[in-house]
């Protein structure tokens, strides 16, 4: 009904504005404030692999505040934390985004540098936000989603098998305005 649609629309735009403001704030946020606003639950699940010198893959989505997630991740994990990203077309905003994400030790690799990332000689956690439409339809898996054929990326699975890395997933939950957990 119209009332429900209006409510959903208002909540969406409020959340979108929050993400925009939080993204701007992420350029100046301190480590102390960041760890207060974003908590990672059960980091020991992934860290148990770091203790065995085993690298891992962590997969999630562009959901809630993934920018804060990228910043806070190295503060919670013993692995070197690497992220794979798609380069923005605007060089200015691309460099700002990289600077923000790498602020507390997260190391970014462009999609073209994925294999370079995997070849780094360190125990690492490699993070993917794999929720976007595949750019190459040659190596996709087709499945039914919302009653239609949908292409799903298969690169993470292939890389995990090739390098024998376990895969973990993350889900970001908004606790309240400006506060999250994964």
Where are these regions (language model features)?
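Negatively charged linear elements and acidic catalytic determinants
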Residues: 1-36
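Soluble catalytic domains of membrane acyltransferases
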Residues: 27-182
